[in-house]
A protein has these predicted regions:
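Leloir-type glycosyltransferase catalytic cores
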Residues: 41-78, 193-245
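Secretory-pathway glycan-assembly enzymes, especially type II membrane glycosyltransferases
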Residues: 1-67
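Catalytic donor nucleotide-activated moiety binding site of glycosyltransferases and closely related
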Residues: 107-149
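A donor-sugar binding/catalytic signature common to diverse glycosyltransferases
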Residues: 150-197
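Well-ordered, non-membrane alpha-helical segments in soluble/globular domains
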Residues: 10-15, 97-109
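Surface-exposed cleft-lining segments at the edges of enzyme active sites
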Residues: 88-99
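Active-site regions of enzymes building and remodeling cell-envelope glycoconjugates
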Residues: 1-3, 24-28, 41-47, 81, ...
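Short loop/turn segments at strand-loop or loop-helix junctions that form parts
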Residues: 1-7, 31-34, 78-90, 122-124, ...
Length: 245
C-alpha cells in the first residue's frame, strides 16, 4: 500500500492495512523518502520509519554514497530548540494525544532542564494552535512552503539556529542529524539509534557516531529506476519468505 496516512487518496488503504494486519499478515508499505524527498521512496514491511522491517540489519556502507548527502560534523552552537509536529491522521500518531497537548508536554518537560528558546513548528498540513503566552520564551513559527517544489519547506534555513530538534517520528529529525544537530525522538523514529532519549541532557546532548546509522538508512529508500529493476522487491521478498510467510 501507499503510506499509512489515512487521508485523501491514501485513506482507502486503511481497510487493506487493518484487514491484513488483524490477521497477522504482512503488508508492504511504500512511503515518500526522507533522505532524498521527492526523489526516493521508503519501502518496508508492516509500517514506516523505524516500525517497518527494511531487511537492513546487517548492511555495509556501499550504498550510502549514492545519496550524495553531506554528513556535517555535530555542532555545539545554535540556541533554539525546535519541536516539530507531524500529521495526526497518520498511523504513526496512534496512541498519542492531540498535537496541541503533545506540544505542551514537550515544552513542560524541556523547561525542567533549560530556559533555551523553544520554537514550535507544526506540520505544514496539520496546523495547530497552543497558548504560548503561558510559557517563557516559546513561540510558534510555522513552516514556509517552497513554491518551486512539490512540498519542500524552509526547514534547512530554520535549522541554522537550532541547538536541538524534537520530533516523534517524522523526517525533520533525519535532516537535523545530517546537519549535525542533536535530536530527541521516540522509538518509532528512524533517527532513534543516533538520538537522545531524555531531556535531562538537553544542555549537553549525545552526539554518537553515525556511520552504522547511515549504512542502515541507505537501505530504507530507493529510486524509481531501482524499483523498476526490482532491487528493493528482491530484498523485501527474501525477508517475507524468511520471516513472515
Amino acid at each position: 500500500i501507499w503510506s499509512v496516512l489515512w487521508q485523501g487518496r491514501m485513506a482507502k488503504y486503511r481497510n487493506i492495512w487493518e484487514t491484513y494486519r488483524n490477521k497477522d499478515k504482512p503488508v508492504v508499505v511504500i512511503e515518500v523518502g526522507g533522505i532524498k524527498r521527492n526523489e526516493t521512496w521508503k519501502i518496508g514491511i508492516n509500517g514506516v520509519n523505524r516500525e517497518a522491517d527494511f531487511h537492513n540489519d546487517s548492511v555495509g556502507g556501499e550504498r550510502w554514497g549514492k545519496f550524495n548527502v553531506e554528513l556535517r560534523p555535530w555542532k555545539q552552537t545554535g540556541h533554539d530548540i525546535i519541536v516539530c509536529g507531524q500529521h495526526t491522521n497518520s498511523h504513526q500518531w496512534r496512541n498519542n494525544p492531540p498535537m496541541s497537548k503533545w506540544f505542551d508536554q514537550q515544552i513542560t518537560e524541556i523547561r525542567k532542564y533549560t530556559d533555551k528558546p523553544i520554537i514550535i513548528r507544526p506540520h505544514p498540513r496539520n496546523h495547530v494552535l497552543i497558548d504560548t503566552a503561558k510559557y517563557k520564551n516559546v513561540k510558534i513559527v510555522g513552516p514556509k512552503r517552497d513554491r518551486n517544489t512539490y512540498d519542500d519547506t524552509d526547514l534547512a534555513e530554520r535549522l541554522k539556529s537550532a541547538w536541538a530538534v524534537v520530533s516523534h517520528s517524522s523526517n525533520p529529525a533525519m535532516t537535523a542529524v545530517f546537519s549535525g544537530i542533536p535530536v530527541y525522538v521516540s522509538e518509532a523514529s528512524l533517527s532513534y539509534d543516533v538520538g537522545n532519549k531524555t531531556f535531562e541532557n538537553i544542555n549537553q546532548p549525545n552526539m554518537p557516531d553515525r556511520q552504522k546509522w547511515t549504512n542502515k538508512l541507505s537501505y530504507t529508500e530507493w529510486w524509481t529506476d531501482e524499483i523498476e529493476q526490482g532491487l528493493p522487491w528482491k530484498r523485501i521478498k527474501k525477508r517475507l519468505e524468511e520471516k513472515y510467510l
